[in-house]
């Protein structure tokens, strides 16, 4: 669900912004989702330690489904962005707790293999996303509802099935652990990044980089980012433990992940618009053009996961 929704929107965004006349907010439909999912991901692990894996995982599914329904019913770009942010809150739990649950039930030596399988499922969903998004976007109406709205409504039956399956088979003993949850850190992080993005992606291009609003949002965003880092150094259980960056391996892999993620998500979001507007392709054709990228993700996820489990070596794979 979470992987599908990261990519299914990309090929339909052109149709959405045309209906809502929201080209200036184009990237925010994706950014809002990624921002809230990123902020909520670290919180879910601690919350599930307190209340149990299954109930928190199911809460994440319900939150995601509610966001999906409201996104499909949106009447303007502001509503769509807000409901996509709600979807992201649910998606953060789906992404985080999947790995946590794997860690609970799979021996350490075998986790690489299962995480490889998870990566493959993630990749297949990412492949299907642009194709499904293109299919729905190219159909003006389906069952009397605008085609693009189905990119959100399709989540509902899948999510309901997931709720039924997790209720039936996910029985992990509850081991309560006391945690201090860093809500303030999450708020500071989301607010600072949001303000900086508002300055860089909306006010700067629209009103000019010297405009008072552009400068104000950028300055406040940077100040909040500094406050976030200061708070994380003092928080009992920070959302982003700064001491982790003293670990050379963690620092390098985080940097690599940021660079690769920026390029990958930039391509996933902007390439469909390029194919449709500049090249004149349909939404479905734009989705087909993304298949090579997604197939590369699928294949390397499977192979690297199995190789790490088999040999126990991991450093060579980021280099490769």
At which residue positions do the language-model features occur?
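Transmembrane core module of solute transporters
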Residues: 1-40, 210-220, 224-320
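Transmembrane-helix bundle of Major Facilitator Superfamily
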Residues: 1-168
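Juxtamembrane loop-transmembrane helix junctions in multi-pass integral membrane proteins
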Residues: 21, 25, 55, 75-78, ...
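Alpha-helical transmembrane segments of polytopic integral membrane proteins
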Residues: 129, 163, 167, 193-196, ...
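Hydrophobic transmembrane-helix bundles of small-molecule transporters
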Residues: 138-256
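Hydrophobic residues within membrane-embedded alpha-helical segments of Major Facilitator Superfamily
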Residues: 1, 13, 63, 70, ...
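Helix-loop junctions at the membrane-solvent interface of multi-pass transporters
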Residues: 66-74, 139-140, 167-172, 203-204, ...
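Cytoplasmic-side transmembrane-helix entry/capping segments in multi-pass membrane proteins
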Residues: 59, 111-124, 178-188, 246, ...
């Amino acid at each position: 669900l979470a992987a599908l929704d990261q990519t299914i929107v990309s090929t339909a965004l052109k149709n959405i912004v045309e209906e809502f006349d929201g080209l200036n907010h184009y990237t925010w439909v994706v950014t809002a989702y990624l921002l809230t999912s990123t902020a909520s991901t670290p919180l879910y692990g601690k919350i599930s330690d307190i209340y149990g894996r299954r109930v928190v995982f199911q809460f994440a599914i319900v939150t995601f489904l509610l966001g999906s329904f409201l996104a499909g019913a949106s009447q303007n770009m502001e509503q769509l962005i807000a409901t996509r942010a709600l979807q992201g809150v649910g998606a953060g739990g789906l992404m985080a707790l999947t790995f946590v649950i794997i860690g609970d039930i799979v021996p350490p030596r075998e986790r690489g293999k299962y995480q490889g399988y998870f990566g493959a499922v993630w990749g297949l969903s990412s492949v299907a996303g642009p194709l499904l998004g293109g299919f729905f976007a190219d159909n003006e109406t389906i069952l009397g509802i605008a085609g693009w709205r189905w990119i959100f409504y399709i989540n509902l039956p899948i999510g309901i099935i997931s709720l039924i399956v997790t209720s039936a088979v996910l029985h992990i003993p509850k081991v309560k652990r006391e945690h201090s949850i860093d809500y303030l850190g999450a708020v500071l992080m989301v607010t600072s990044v949001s303000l900086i993005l508002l300055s860089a992606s909306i006010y700067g291009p629209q009103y000019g980089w010297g405009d008072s609003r552009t400068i104000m949002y950028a300055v406040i965003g940077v100040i909040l980012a500094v406050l976030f880092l200061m708070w994380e150094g003092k928080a009992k259980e920070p959302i982003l433990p700064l001491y982790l960056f003293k670990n050379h391996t963690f620092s390098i892999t985080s940097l690599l992940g940021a660079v690769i993620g920026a390029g990958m998500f930039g391509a996933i979001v902007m390439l469909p618009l390029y194919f449709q507007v500049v090249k004149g392709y349909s939404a479905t054709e734009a989705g087909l053009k993304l298949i090579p990228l997604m197939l590369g993700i699928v294949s390397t996820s499977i192979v690297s996961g199995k190789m790490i489990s088999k040999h126990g070596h991991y450093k060579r794979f980021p280099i490769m």
